[in-house]
């Protein structure tokens, strides 16, 4: 556990390259910590109800990488580590936050993403329907995340099993 995202990123990169011999930013088996609450991917009737900041997800399968809206995304099949009875699910990850020195997208980046997604629905005449389409767009709702091997102290709102996190 470290005090800053910058330091966590340096340690994570070193662990991935020198111990796990992984060169890519994302690999099957990676455990990622969610950095922003997400209400889109799980139904309200699911065990957790939503994906919370601090939850850990494990990547079971990487379906594809997508570059869209000048950002990088990964479509993956994931499992929530803290909820073993919760079925695994398909989701989209926002890779911009994976190595970011900030916890999540900044205000300007978030606004830029919103505007670019809105362009996809510019042919919708009704402002309300356009707003609903934007808010239900899978890329707009991509999960912000950081690598869960090393984490900083202010990102954690719950206790993490470090044996699982470090050893995968």
Q: Where are each of the predicted segments found?
A:
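Core RecA-like ATPase module of SF1/SF2 helicases and allied nucleic-acid translocases
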Residues: 1-168
